[in-house]
């Protein structure tokens, strides 16, 4: 970011000027999207095709708004393949290793010429064959490097058998030259592999590594862009020389987690003069603020949940544009591919349990502790009577035949998570427990939500945040139970 701040305006590319708001993004007109594409994936729906056409036609920046379950990554795979048909070179990034590996796994069956940057220990086993580290050992160019390595090893072994000092000195000299040759050939091998790859994938941070120095790309694609800090997104932009940026994400889910004490403080953007900018303001957010729907297309069909579960987030957050696919709109727990009894829980998609008036009072975890005593959970909140109700409902699901590994219990508070863990972890082996924030991006057949808050002041705290409620309501396929 220091480099970016010091860069004079005269050096800004067209894309940079658009991202800073110094120039307006060129609006895509219907005629720009008139080209009929030869779709490689016949399963795409109309909104996915529209988003791909829009991204291809956009000259500088395009946002693909993909709510959970709408096939955002599925859409990106087709977009990448369409870009390759146009002979474009792509740098594909995400804020985490798992977000990048997910794309690599989806691209792999299509024999895309790609390389994944990153340490092998941090990558999923299924993507290792595409990692730069493995390719440098298995490619044709790697064979020459291996030959030099073998020769070095042989020279090292011969030293131990040589007693003559002059001969040992000569061998050391040969090894020194071999090491120099080895480093040069290894660097050439690595550089060649990256240079010849039409698709390079890395985390946003990893895109700033030396492997991409002097490499040029036509397009940067960032998946999970609404989970990435804006500063992270500038790393591939500055290293790639790309003229187009495609961001995919959902700004109506939780933003990246910021632990800085002044993260909420509002500052003015030094480049654009815009106010209301803080660390939680993502590049996706800022582009929407600058250009609105002119740079965005939304995926409108979700393939995850029953239409009744879909109703609240669609109406409250997605302008009633989000619809359930025919294949899932009436799907219930009783329809699972194993034997499940028909009960009140397995024949309904949404169940609310009202604990009002039942003395289900919340408590702060340090209420009963001296202020000087440190608490493992800080000042998080819990509600033990509500946790007991949750246990009862989980038991009813299991008794009906739902497998524990298909059930998740989520709660917004770590204090309640600790209480639930004590009650459920050993009794229901395989059940998944997590915070609402931590469970984002995952899904289960049935989710029980423990909301915790119950007080005379009717305060709900950060549960008033719509994006947090959205994350809570979009993790389940067949049933959600809220306590």
Model-flagged regions — what are they?
Residues 2-6, 104, 310, 421:
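A short local structural element in Rossmann-fold oxidoreductases
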Residues 21, 25-136, 177-184, 189-318, ...:
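ASCE P-loop NTPase helicase motor core
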Residues 86, 96, 205-483:
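Conserved helicase motor core of SF1/SF2 NTP-dependent helicases
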Residues 1-41, 139-148, 168:
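Intrinsically disordered, low-complexity accessory regions that flank the conserved helicase/ATPase core
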Residues 133-176, 239, 243, 473:
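ATP-hydrolysis module of ASCE/P-loop NTPase motor domains
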Residues 172, 180-181, 482-483:
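Ser/Thr/Gly-rich flexible loops in soluble cytosolic domains mediating phosphotransfer, phosphorylation
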């Amino acid at each position: 970011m220091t480099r970016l701040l010091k860069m004079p305006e005269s050096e800004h590319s067209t894309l940079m000027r658009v991202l800073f708001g110094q120039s307006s993004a060129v609006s895509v007109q219907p005629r720009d999207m008139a080209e009929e594409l030869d779709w490689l994936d016949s399963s795409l729906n109309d909104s996915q095709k529209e988003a791909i056409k829009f991204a291809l036609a956009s000259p500088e920046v395009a946002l693909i708004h993909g709510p959970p379950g709408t096939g955002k990554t599925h859409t990106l795979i087709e977009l990448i393949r369409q870009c390759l048909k146009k002979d474009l070179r792509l740098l594909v990034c995400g804020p985490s290793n798992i977000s990048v590996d997910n794309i690599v796994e989806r691209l792999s069956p299509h024999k895309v010429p790609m390389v994944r940057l990153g340490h092998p220990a941090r990558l999923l086993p299924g993507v290792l064959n595409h990692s730069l580290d493995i390719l440098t050992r298995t490619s044709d160019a790697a064979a020459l490097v291996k030959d030099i390595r073998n020769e070095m090893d042989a020279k090292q072994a011969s030293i131990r058998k040589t007693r003559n000092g002059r001969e040992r000195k000569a061998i050391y000299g040969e090894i020194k030259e071999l090491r120099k040759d080895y480093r040069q050939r290894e660097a050439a091998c690595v550089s060649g592999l990256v240079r010849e790859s039409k698709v390079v994938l890395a985390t946003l941070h990893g895109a700033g590594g030396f492997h991409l120095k002097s490499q040029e790309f036509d397009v940067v694609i960032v998946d999970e862009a609404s989970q990435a800090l804006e500063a992270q997104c500038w790393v591939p932009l500055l290293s790639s020389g790309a003229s187009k940026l495609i961001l995919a994400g959902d700004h109506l889910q939780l933003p990246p987690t910021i632990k800085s004490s002044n993260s909420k403080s509002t500052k003015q953007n030094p480049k654009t003069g815009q106010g209301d900018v803080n660390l939680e303001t993502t590049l996706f957010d800022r582009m929407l603020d600058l250009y609105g729907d002119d740079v965005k297309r939304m995926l409108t069909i979700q393939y995850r949940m029953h239409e009744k579960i879909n109703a609240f987030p669609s109406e409250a957050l997605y302008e009633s544009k989000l619809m359930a696919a025919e294949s899932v709109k009436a799907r219930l727990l009783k329809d699972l591919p194993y034997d499940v009894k028909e009960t009140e829980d397995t024949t309904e998609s949404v169940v609310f349990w009202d604990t009002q008036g039942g003395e289900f009072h919340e408590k702060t975890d340090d209420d009963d502790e001296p202020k000087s005593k440190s608490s493992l959970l800080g000042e998080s909140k819990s509600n033990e009577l509500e946790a007991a109700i949750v246990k009862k409902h989980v038991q009813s699901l299991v008794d009906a035949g739902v497998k524990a590994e298909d059930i998740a219990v989520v709660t917004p508070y770590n204090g309640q998570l600790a209480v639930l863990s004590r009650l459920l972890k050993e009794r229901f082996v395989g059940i998944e427990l997590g915070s609402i924030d931590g469970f984002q991006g995952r899904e289960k057949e049935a989710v029980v939500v423990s909301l915790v808050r119950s007080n005379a002041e009717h305060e709900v705290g950060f549960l008033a945040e719509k994006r947090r409620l959205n994350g809570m309501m979009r993790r389940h396929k067949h049933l959600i139970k809220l306590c």
